[in-house]
Amino acid sequence: MWLWEDQGGLLGPFSFLLLVLLLVTRSPVNACLLTGSLFVLLRVFSFEPVPSCRALQVLKPRDRISAIAHRGGSHDAPENTLAAIRQAAKNGATGVELDIEFTSDGIPVLMHDNTVDRTTDGTGRLCDLTFEQIRKLNPAANHRLRNDFPDEKIPTLREAVAECLNHNLTIFFDVKGHAHKATEALKKMYMEFPQLYNNSVVCSFLPEVIYKMRQTDRDVITALTHRPWSLSHTGDGKPRYDTFWKHFIFVMMDILLDWSMHNILWYLCGISAFLMQKDFVSPAYLKKWSAKGIQVVGWTVNTFDEKSYYESHLGSSYITDSMVEDCEPHF
């Protein structure tokens, strides 16, 4: 019955869909047939979520709110490095969020951007550089504390996993793209380090990445990441496009994406958590997802007041750029 519960199931979305199809087709029979067909397809191709008891052990270990260091804690140490992982553990983080990218020779490494310009002393697209070339770069070169981390290298995915497990940190693998390559690389990690099944989450803004991960391994805990208006606006709220019509089209796409994320895609992918931009998380929002058996993690929560609100009022886990002080968000 949970499927059709008013707050937690699919009754609302499919009732809305039926109404839209009635308006479009002007035929009750055709609208009902189309709605029913879409529901059957969703049921056939969707994945069952990982058992909630196991997901909770990962998302809220020891039934406590998790503080997750964004990119390893990009304010406290050079982002996506082994030093950041060690520093996050030292500063009391429950887990770390790490970004996966690939070199031109297919080696999975930790990197947020598709170029090395922002974080290192090199230039160029990551997909044009071999692992040997990127290994020579300094990932601390442009960090505010670069003098404290003189010997850092861009780590491989395997090196990062081993370091996290050594410090008993939960890992949030953030996948930006390359659905096939990323899921294959992660599957190898889960096979080599089976403890990851109880110590990690694969998350992405891209539903196809999460769906592919569930296809590859249904035992992996997954999460969708979302920021409303992300297609039409940048992280700091500025419009991405100058022309009215282009902006309007992407606003409409944002509305469709947001509706799909909250009403259909969570069920299709069988996720266990939803990573939401911090400003859109409220008690009512948490209640909505809780009715679906899904945990909400807010990002990026960077001030003492925000952290206190999440811990004391919301009772929700969060991702932060710093475990030790207030800082500006890192987009």
Curated annotation (Swiss-Prot):
Q: Which cofactor does it need?
A: Mg(2+)
Protein's name in the database: Glycerophosphodiester phosphodiesterase 1
Q: Specify which residues bind Mg(2+) according to the UniProt entry for this protein.
A: E97, D99, D174
Tissues expressing this chain: Widely expressed.
Query: What is its subcellular localisation?
Result: Cell membrane; Cytoplasmic vesicle membrane
State its role.
Hydrolyzes the phosphodiester bond of glycerophosphodiesters such as glycerophosphoinositol (GroPIns) and glycerophosphoethanolamine (GroPEth), to yield a glycerol phosphate and an alcohol. Hydrolyzes glycerophospho-N-acylethanolamines to N-acylethanolamines in the brain and participates in bioactive N-acylethanolamine biosynthesis such as anandamide (an endocannabinoid), N-palmitoylethanolamine (an anti-inflammatory), and N-oleoylethanolamine (an anorexic).
For whether the record's keyword set contains Transferase, the answer is: no
The record describes its membrane topology as: Multi-pass membrane protein
Q: Gene name on record?
A: GDE1
Describe the protein's quaternary organization and the partners it interacts with: Interacts with PRAF2. Interacts with RGS16.
Residues modified by carbohydrate are N168, N198
Q: Report domain GP-PDE positions.
A: 65-331
Give the organism, scientific name. Homo sapiens (Human)
UniProt record similarity statement = Belongs to the glycerophosphoryl diester phosphodiesterase family.
Listed under GO biological process in this entry are:
ethanolamine metabolic process; glycerophospholipid catabolic process; lipid metabolic process; N-acylethanolamine metabolic process; phospholipid metabolic process
The record places the following residue ranges in the Lumenal compartment, namely 25-247
From what superkingdom does this record's organism come? Eukaryota
What EC numbers are recorded for this enzyme?
Answer: 3.1.4.44, 3.1.4.-
Q: Does the keyword Membrane apply?
A: yes
Report the catalytic activity.
Answer: sn-glycero-3-phospho-1D-myo-inositol + H2O = myo-inositol + sn-glycerol 3-phosphate + H(+); 1-O-(1Z-octadecenyl)-sn-glycero-3-phospho-(N-5Z,8Z,11Z,14Z-eicosatetraenoyl)-ethanolamine + H2O = 1-O-(1Z-octadecenyl)-sn-glycero-3-phosphate + N-(5Z,8Z,11Z,14Z-eicosatetraenoyl)-ethanolamine + H(+); 1-O-(1Z-octadecenyl)-sn-glycero-3-phospho-(N-9Z-octadecenoyl)-ethanolamine + H2O = 1-O-(1Z-octadecenyl)-sn-glycero-3-phosphate + N-(9Z-octadecenoyl) ethanolamine + H(+); 1-O-(1Z-octadecenyl)-sn-glycero-3-phospho-N-hexadecanoyl-ethanolamine + H2O = 1-O-(1Z-octadecenyl)-sn-glycero-3-phosphate + N-hexadecanoylethanolamine + H(+)
PTM notes: N-glycosylated.
**Gene Ontology cellular component list:** cytoplasmic vesicle membrane; membrane; plasma membrane
Please list the coiled coil stretches: none
